Amino acid sequence: MSTLNQAHCEACRADAPQVSDEELPILIKQIPDWNIEVRDSIMQLEKVFLFKNFKHALAFTNAVGEISEAEGHHPGLLTEWGKVTVTWWSHSIKGLHRNDFIMAARTDEVAKTAEGRK
């Protein structure tokens, strides 16, 4: 069981360390349905959530927005008909920080109660 979903983000400065090669496999095991993507040499966490229609996808997007605002850490969100792609990375350090794993786990928690999930 992941404890990341109960953790809170810490302020991430430009000089904060990225997740180490040793930490990465430990953290990713706690969010097994997320993929690591590399774009422009920047590692990111990404997951696609499927919904029955656009209304449910948009409601989920807004719910993720609420937890993001509360933690002061914001994802890339692509909302389409029946689908939301959520991408987490730390802009200030151009890579992955523990905050990204926390927010991925918290996104999964929001998804558990999201209406209209497929």
UniProtKB/Swiss-Prot annotation:
Keywords: Lyase. It catalyses: (4aS,6R)-4a-hydroxy-L-erythro-5,6,7,8-tetrahydrobiopterin = (6R)-L-erythro-6,7-dihydrobiopterin + H2O. GO terms for biological process: tetrahydrobiopterin biosynthetic process. One of its GO terms (molecular function) is 4-alpha-hydroxytetrahydrobiopterin dehydratase activity. The keyword Ribonucleoprotein does not apply. It is an enzyme of class 4 (lyase). InterPro entries: PCD_sf (IPR036428), Pterin-4-alpha-carb_dehyd (IPR050376), Pterin_deHydtase (IPR001533). Pfam families: Pterin_4a. Its EC number is 4.2.1.96. Belongs to the pterin-4-alpha-carbinolamine dehydratase family. HAMAP family: Pterin_4_alpha (MF_00434). This is Putative pterin-4-alpha-carbinolamine dehydratase.
